């Protein structure tokens, strides 16, 4: 049987870059675990901010964390109080000063991770899965996506037998390496058990002469303090 490889991992070094950007020889495993702890802490603290990506860079031993969020105001807080508390918490975990940047996601409707999390939250609130999927597809296509595919799996609607339902509009060329495909997964914890949500969003093709070929998403958004 065929299986779908993660489209982001397949395109690393082609039109996507890594979310952890640093080099370490013998210290690799410790820094990797530090990254996992920092990401877990941020996702837990900022669950209401619509966090899509957390990019961690370590130039000259000082970590630099960039948070891509749909609601940066929730991260920053009143007069910057929340972001300062967050920075102190990360500094305590990392054992060294941490530089923190917030980048606003201007179109959360075409961010695969945020779309998947939104559908998962609707499933937890007992919204009909077909309605949630169709609404997400319509919003994404309206805001400029060239194609979108959504998979929902599990005991959908409380059914006795788990199944997979999917909905697609436009084209999603998973085999085309120059295609800019965003991918996100989320889990809905319902009273009947867990339901998985997968989202693929095709945003267009990145050509060799495109100056944003390294990472279109990073070039679209300018960091803000």
Swiss-Prot record:
Write one Pfam family the protein is assigned to. Answer: KH_2
Listed SUPFAM superfamilies: Prokaryotic type KH domain (KH-domain type II), Ribosomal protein S3 C-terminal domain
- What residue range is the signal peptide? none
Highest taxon above the source species:
Bacteria
Its assembly, as annotated, is: Part of the 30S ribosomal subunit. Forms a tight complex with proteins S10 and S14.
Q: Tell me, what does this protein do in biology?
A: Binds the lower part of the 30S subunit head. Binds mRNA in the 70S ribosome, positioning it for translation.
> What family does this belong to?
Belongs to the universal ribosomal protein uS3 family.
Q: Which protein, by its recorded name, is this? A: Small ribosomal subunit protein uS3
């Amino acid at each position: 049987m065929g299986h779908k490889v993660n489209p982001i991992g397949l395109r690393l070094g082609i039109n996507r870059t890594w979310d952890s950007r640093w080099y370490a020889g013998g210290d690799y495993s410790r820094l990797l675990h530090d990254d996992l702890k920092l990401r877990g802490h941020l996702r837990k603290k900022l669950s209401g901010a619509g966090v899509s990506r957390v990019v961690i860079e370590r130039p000259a031993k000082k970590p630099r964390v960039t948070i891509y969020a749909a609601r940066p105001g929730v991260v920053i807080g009143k007069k910057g109080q929340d972001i300062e508390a967050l920075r102190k918490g990360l500094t305590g975990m990392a054992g060294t000063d941490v530089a923190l940047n917030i980048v606003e996601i201007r179109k959360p409707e075409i961010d695969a991770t945020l779309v998947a999390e939104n559908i998962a939250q609707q499933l937890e609130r007992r919204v009909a899965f077909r309605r949630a999927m169709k609404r997400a597809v319509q919003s994404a296509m309206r805001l400029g996506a060239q194609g979108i595919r959504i998979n929902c799996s599990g005991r959908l609607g409380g059914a006795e037998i788990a199944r997979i339902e999917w909905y697609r509009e436009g084209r999603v060329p998973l085999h085309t390496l120059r295609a800019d495909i965003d991918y996100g997964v989320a889990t809905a914890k319902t009273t009947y058990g867990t339901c998985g949500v997968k989202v693929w969003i095709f945003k267009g093709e990145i050509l060799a002469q495109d100056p944003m070929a390294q990472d279109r998403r990073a070039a679209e958004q300018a960091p803000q303090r």
